[in-house]
């Protein structure tokens, strides 16, 4: 389903039905990302926009790729928050249980292993450490990376929004040309009617 339009005849004039699909290359998937989720996003955006020509097809692919990138970066930022919380947890557990046990408990907690989660909750409660404080400390530990990812997310969203504006501008220009052509045809028809 990596072609841009699932059914070109539903979206394009009959004259374009026999054109080969434009090769945009494979989906820009990172390790662990699911191709069918990307394809679903591509299909839904294509159906919403209904690209009318090759330029709009290119912009739709850009919009999908940039939306996918922004979603990936948001997941990355959430992952960095988890990494930061794990690091903060390990630092807070070291004086309580020792270096090796703190590392193991923090890894298990980050992996959401039930036994590790329970042990961590007990140690935190017994020592008056709130999870919110660990999250804040973890944010501080990863703040530079999270800020960079946030800037990258904003840049991807800005590029996506620019592509959306290009489609709108392209359609406005096309509509203006079509109106002018209709007006010219009507004027020609009126002149022919007066001449006869």
Predicted regions and their residues:
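Intrinsically disordered, low-complexity, charged/polar segments
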Residues: 1-196
């Amino acid at each position: 389903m990596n072609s841009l339009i699932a059914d070109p005849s539903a979206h394009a004039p009959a004259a374009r039905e026999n054109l080969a699909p434009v090769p945009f290359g494979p989906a820009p998937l990172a390790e662990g990302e699911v191709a069918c989720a990307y394809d679903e996003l591509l299909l839904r955006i294509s159906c919403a926009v209904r690209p009318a020509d090759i330029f709009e097809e290119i912009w739709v692919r850009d919009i999908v790729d940039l939306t996918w990138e922004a979603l990936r970066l948001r997941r990355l930022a959430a992952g960095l928050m988890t990494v930061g919380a794990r690091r903060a947890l390990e630092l807070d557990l070291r004086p309580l249980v020792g270096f090796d046990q703190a590392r193991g408990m923090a890894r298990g907690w980050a992996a959401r292993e039930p036994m590790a989660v329970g042990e961590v909750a007990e140690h935190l409660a017994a020592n008056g450490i709130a999870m919110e404080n660990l999250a804040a400390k973890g944010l501080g530990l990863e703040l530079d990376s999270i800020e960079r990812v946030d800037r990258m997310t904003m840049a991807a969203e800005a590029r996506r929004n620019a592509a959306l504006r290009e489609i709108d501008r392209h359609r406005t220009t096309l509509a203006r040309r079509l109106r002018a052509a209709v007006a010219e045809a009507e004027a020609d028809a009126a002149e022919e009617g007066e001449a006869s």
